[in-house]
Amino acid sequence: MSRRHRAVKRQVEPDIRYKSPLVAHLVNVIMKSGKKNLAQRIVYGAFEKVSEKLEKGDPVDLLLGALENARPRLEVKSRRVGGATYQVPIEISFERQESLALRWIVDAASGRKGIPMKEALAAEIIDAYNNTGNVVKKKEDTHKMAQANRAFAHLRW
């Protein structure tokens, strides 16, 4: 990792159907081995299921609501001081909050065995939108860990 200068953030192209960079990011998180077409089918199928179940209109707005409930504000990073390693709580940027929330939603969906991925993804989005489920629990666990290690906040770098 070069320390000369920060890498330039590249713009994610909006997806074809919803014209949203957020949906394109979700597709990229789901994609494995370059199979973008399959990832798009999974995401669009999940959005159709979410629209059917919640009947609230635009699935992108529902995804935004789910992300708002799943987005962590703090996380802990290991910091070695002397011979001891401390878990230091730090605030995280909006981009990282969004990326973590999307990754957690996809991981929780793939953890639901026995049902197709598009249905699992739809269920996770609905659970996160309703402030329940594995993703919200993971966020709360992360916040609890940061709260428990608040005494080491002065070691922030």
From Swiss-Prot:
UniProt keyword terms in alphabetical order: Ribonucleoprotein, Ribosomal protein, RNA-binding, rRNA-binding, tRNA-binding
Superkingdom assignment: Bacteria
PROSITE patterns xref list: RIBOSOMAL_S7 (PS00052)
GO cellular component labels: small ribosomal subunit
Any one GO biological process: translation
UniProt keyword annotation of Transcription present: no
Signal peptide: none
A Pfam family per the record: Ribosomal_S7
One of the record's GO molecular function terms: tRNA binding
Keyword Ribosomal protein (UniProt): yes
Subunit record text: Part of the 30S ribosomal subunit. Contacts proteins S9 and S11.
Family recorded in the similarity comment: Belongs to the universal ribosomal protein uS7 family.
Function: One of the primary rRNA binding proteins, it binds directly to 16S rRNA where it nucleates assembly of the head domain of the 30S subunit. Is located at the subunit interface close to the decoding center, probably blocks exit of the E-site tRNA.
Descriptive protein name: Small ribosomal subunit protein uS7
